[in-house]
């Protein structure tokens, strides 16, 4: 049976050997060039392919149409992937009539995504395994063909567990590959409600936070022990690596990070103490804990820190333009909850952020971005991260004031983008789900979906096209001038402080706010073109948590990425949204203050939005990038969001002149 193989690492080598032993004909192997910054302790797929006389390739982008065509010419009957590090596009997967299969280093559906070997140790698991599954468009989500469990011993570290998994993988492939060859396999669908997903790990993720328990820190040490980069901490500005450790049941009132003793080298943790058995100062040699203490100049009572002392002195400065808006005020709240951010904000009002005005790490100026250009340029230069959140983002304005939409959403934001390029500042830019336009894909994918809009005489697309062009400009600045950026695309975020009822009165609000106003005033809920258009509604708390993780940017995983932030499980039509909102309204304790429900009324979009409007039938995000880059999943059910949003707005209504 002819196959094409995508492979890397030890698992790639053993997968190739297993295929050859099972009588498969390998037409070509696709692998990666080795990263010079990565310690290559594993076998070389390229070398193995060369020794076996098999053509081998390492393209930067195997999903490029030219490579898809070359693979098609090989006419593979089946495709295998063994620890290949890039997602393989659906066009390639569809080339093999017998399907495509991937070997994954966990017991799926648990630990989908990157680095499952390390993550299971970080999380203190006692069992993992290997899974062979059918490949589908979503990473690690296809039906399971075979699994083998592997016990994790208390003394296992990453390399010993790696060897166990390799042994299990050989067994699994020896048992399963002949069955695939003869078409004799039983596939079991994964249980999506049990799925967990983890992102890529980088060396920077392995710092030891001493306020955590000793067992948690010990698991971190196990997860990244040699030949991985190692867990680390600091004495002042001196970095040191912990290669092996033990949990010590030492009851101490010492502050976390304090040295309890130097022989053995014992460090107080949030719970218990961690004994550093072996370690390394800077780029030096590995030594036992007591010698490491001497090398680092530690004595009883010394304090360790999780980051260099010089870095700990200054908070990250975040500039939020449009800080009083829906996203801006919720993001400010999330940032100020931590102690390492200084927030600078500009907006034309302050009603939503009044609760922060006396906060010592919040600095606000009331003003217009089109007027305060000098203030903005100065603060772009001063701050570390810039979020230009100012935009007109209500559909009725796209047809009512298209030029104003263009001037604010495009021209003013382009100026800010250029400031970020000039001063080499990181920009986190709010793209929009609107850029996908009338895309027909089931899931809108950041990297593959086409962006399709209507004709020029439909001005409702001016917002979408303005945002899309800014996305492309930012991307080009990143490619050509090194701009550090992330684009995020919110999908119908909802929650308290989304617009206000006064904005809804003039039609300049998002859907749920307009519907709430109809209930408050006793006017009919208008269903535009019947309200059958479907959207995926996302709780503001889920959205802000994802945005916060983009700002945190662990391991720089978000750099140069486009990230959809939405909840594909919360899909509903506007009509269904109205019905859910009505049911919540009827049960609300303040219901008796408001008029009777006036019913639903179907209206044409042209009579509501005006000439030049087009709607979109569905808008469902792929959140593959959010899972990969942020280790993020939305958690909050749509009904909970509706209840809380409704409650917030009803409690803003002046009830003094309402009948009780």
From Swiss-Prot:
GO molecular function: carboxy-lyase activity; UDP-4-amino-4-deoxy-L-arabinose formyltransferase activity; UDP-glucuronate dehydrogenase activity
Enzyme Commission number(s) of this protein: 2.1.2.13, 1.1.1.305
Chain spans, region Dehydrogenase ArnADH: 314-660
Residues of the site described as Raises pKa of active site His: 140
Disulfide bonds: none
Top-level taxon in the UniProt lineage: Bacteria
Binding annotation for NAD(+): 347, 368-369
Site description Transition state stabilizer, residues in chain: 102
Binding site for (6R)-10-formyltetrahydrofolate: 86-88, 114, 136-140
Catalytic activity: UDP-alpha-D-glucuronate + NAD(+) = UDP-beta-L-threo-pentopyranos-4-ulose + CO2 + NADH; UDP-4-amino-4-deoxy-beta-L-arabinose + (6R)-10-formyltetrahydrofolate = UDP-4-deoxy-4-formamido-beta-L-arabinose + (6S)-5,6,7,8-tetrahydrofolate + H(+)
Annotated keywords: Antibiotic resistance, Lipid A biosynthesis, Lipid biosynthesis, Lipid metabolism, Lipopolysaccharide biosynthesis, Multifunctional enzyme, NAD, Oxidoreductase, Transferase
Region (Formyltransferase ArnAFT): 1-304
Family: In the N-terminal section; belongs to the Fmt family. UDP-L-Ara4N formyltransferase subfamily. In the C-terminal section; belongs to the NAD(P)-dependent epimerase/dehydratase family. UDP-glucuronic acid decarboxylase subfamily.
PANTHER family registered for this protein in UniProt: BIFUNCTIONAL POLYMYXIN RESISTANCE PROTEIN ARNA, UDP-D-APIOSE_UDP-D-XYLOSE SYNTHASE 2
Protein name in the entry: Bifunctional polymyxin resistance protein ArnA
Natural source organism: Escherichia coli O1:K1 / APEC
Record gene name: arnA
């Amino acid at each position: 049976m002819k196959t094409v193989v995508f492979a890397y690492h030890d698992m790639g080598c053993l997968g190739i050997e297993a295929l050859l032993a099972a009588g498969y004909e390998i037409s070509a192997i696709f692998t990666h060039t080795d990263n010079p910054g990565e310690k290559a302790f594993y076998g070389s797929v390229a070398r193995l392919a060369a020794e076996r006389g098999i053509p081998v390739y390492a393209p930067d982008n195997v999903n490029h149409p030219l490579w898809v065509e070359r693979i098609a010419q090989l006419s593979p009957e089946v495709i295998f992937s063994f620890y290949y590090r890039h997602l393989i596009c659906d066009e390639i997967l569809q080339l093999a009539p017998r399907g495509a299969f991937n070997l994954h280093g966990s017991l799926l559906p648990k630990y989908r995504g990157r680095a499952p070997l390390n993550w299971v140790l970080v999380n203190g698991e006692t069992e993992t395994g290997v899974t062979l599954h059918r490949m589908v468009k979503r990473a690690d989500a296809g039906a399971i063909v075979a699994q083998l469990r592997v016990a994790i011993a208390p003394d296992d570290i990453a390399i010993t567990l790696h060897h166990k998994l390799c042994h299990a993988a050989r067994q699994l492939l020896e048992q399963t590959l002949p069955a695939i060859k003869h078409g004799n396999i039983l596939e079991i669908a994964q249980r999506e409600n049990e799925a967990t997903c983890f992102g890529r790990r980088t060396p920077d993720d392995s710092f030891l936070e001493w306020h955590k328990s000793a067992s948690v820190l010990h698991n971190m040490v196990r997860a990244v022990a040699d030949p991985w980069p190692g867990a680390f901490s600091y004495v002042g500005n001196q970095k040191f690596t912990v290669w092996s450790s033990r949990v010590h049941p030492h009851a101490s009132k010492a502050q976390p990070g304090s040295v309890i003793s130097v022989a053995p080298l014992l460090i107080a943790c949030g719970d218990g103490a961690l004994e550093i058995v072996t370690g390394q100062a800077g780029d030096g040699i590995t030594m036992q804990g007591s010698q490491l203490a001497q090398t680092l100049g530690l004595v009883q009572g010394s304090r360790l820190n999780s980051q260099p002392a010089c870095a700990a002195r200054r908070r990250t400065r975040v500039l939020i333009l449009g800080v009083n808006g829906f996203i801006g005020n919720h993001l400010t709240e999330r940032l100020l909850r931590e102690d390492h951010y200084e927030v600078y904000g500009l907006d034309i009002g302050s009603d939503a952020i009044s609760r922060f005005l006396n906060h010592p790490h919040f600095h606000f100026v009331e003003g217009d971005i089109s007027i305060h250009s000098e203030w903005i340029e100065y603060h772009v230069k001063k701050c570390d991260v810039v979020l230009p959140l100012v935009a007109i983002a209500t559909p009725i304005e796209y047809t009512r004031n298209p030029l104003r939409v263009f001037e604010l959403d495009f021209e003013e934001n382009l100026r800010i983008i250029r400031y970020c390029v000039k001063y080499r500042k990181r920009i986190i830019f709010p793209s929009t789900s609107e850029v996908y336009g009338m895309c027909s894909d089931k899931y809108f994918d950041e990297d593959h979906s086409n962006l399709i809009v209507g004709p020029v005489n439909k001005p409702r697309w001016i917002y979408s096209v303005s945002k899309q062009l800014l996305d492309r400009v930012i991307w080009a600045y990143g490619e050509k001038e090194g701009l550090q950026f992330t684009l995020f695309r919110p999908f119908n975020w909802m929650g308290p402080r989304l617009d206000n009822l006064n904005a809804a009165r003039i039609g300049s609000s998002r859907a749920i706010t307009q519907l709430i106003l109809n209930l408050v005033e006793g006017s009919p809920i208008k269903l535009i073109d019947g309200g059958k258009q479907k959207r995926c509604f996302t709780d503001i708390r889920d959205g802000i948590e994802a945005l916060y993780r983009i700002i945190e940017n662990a391991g720089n995983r978000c750099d140069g990425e486009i990230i959809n932030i939405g909840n594909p499980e919360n899909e509903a039509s506007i009509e269904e949204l109205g019905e859910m909102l009505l049911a919540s309204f009827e049960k609300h304790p303040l219901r008796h203050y408001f008029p009777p429900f006036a019913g639903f009324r179907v209206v044409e979009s042209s009579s509501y939005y005006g000439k030049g409007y087009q709607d979109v039938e569905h808008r469902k995000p792929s959140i593959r990038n959010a899972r990969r880059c942020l280790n993020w999943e939305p958690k909050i059910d749509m009904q909970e969001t509706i209840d809380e949003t409704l409650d917030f707005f009803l409690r803003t209504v002046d009830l003094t002149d309402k009948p009780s």
